[in-house]
Amino acid sequence: MTVCSRRNFVSGMGAVILMTGTSLPAFAKENKADKPKRYAMIHDENACIGCTACMDSCRDVNQVPEGVSRLEILRSEPYGEFPNQEYEFFRQSCQHCTNAPCVAVCPTGASFIDKETGIVDVHKDLCIGCQYCIAVCPYRVRFIHPIHRTADKCNFCRDTNLANGKQPACVEACPTKALTFGDMNDPTSAVSRKVKEKPVYRTKVELGTQPNLYHIPFQHGEPRR
């Protein structure tokens, strides 16, 4: 687990936008069957306890080697005085951007957005390990798999748990239910409802990436700047 200063912790996340939920107008409420799925995730920073069960489960289910990780939980410096201290935990992983720079720069088409789910993924048989996608990703969440020698990252367990009708490994493992996953194009889904009902933010939205990883901000420390 990474420990960093409050200033570095906040500045490293880039600019954020806070949003409050609003109801969709009647004309915008389309039948969910009219659209493909757009999977998204919410990380609740108030519920997360930094136990890293999500990281361990991801590593196990997706056979991620030691030394690399598809997701990280970053921990801030403590707020308050001992013994009444609290920590802020931040999930860092692929944002599954609707406008993904990694897809745009890939010379072989290995980096792609799955049309059925909106998940950003990698065709390992097409990847040549050029690392263009790693260089261009503003979230710094891609890496070269040390065994396959291809680009790798979180893919919401698309080829493991999701393929078997389960939730992503991190969601299933979280003991405090800090993660919510589902289809943003389904207005009845838990993730869609929560984005409308809770104050949420996404990181580096000013870059136009349209990330699909949302965060419910930590309420007990300093306000984000």
UniProtKB/Swiss-Prot annotation:
Highest rank taxon of the organism: Bacteria
InterPro entries given for it? Answer: 4Fe4S_Fe-S-bd, 4Fe4S_Fe_S_CS, Cyt_c_NO2Rdtase_NrfC, ET_IronSulfur_Cluster-Binding, TAT_signal
For whether the record's keyword set contains Transport, the answer is yes
Keyword 4Fe-4S recorded: yes
Q: Which residues form the 4Fe-4S ferredoxin-type domain?
A: 39-67, 85-116, 118-147
| Disulphide bonds in the chain | none
Which Pfam families does the annotation name?
A: Fer4_11 (PF13247), Fer4_4 (PF12800)
Q: Where does [4Fe-4S] cluster 4 bind?
A: 106, 127, 130, 133
Please give the function described in this protein's UniProt entry: Probably involved in the transfer of electrons from the quinone pool to the type-c cytochromes.
Name of protein? Protein NrfC homolog
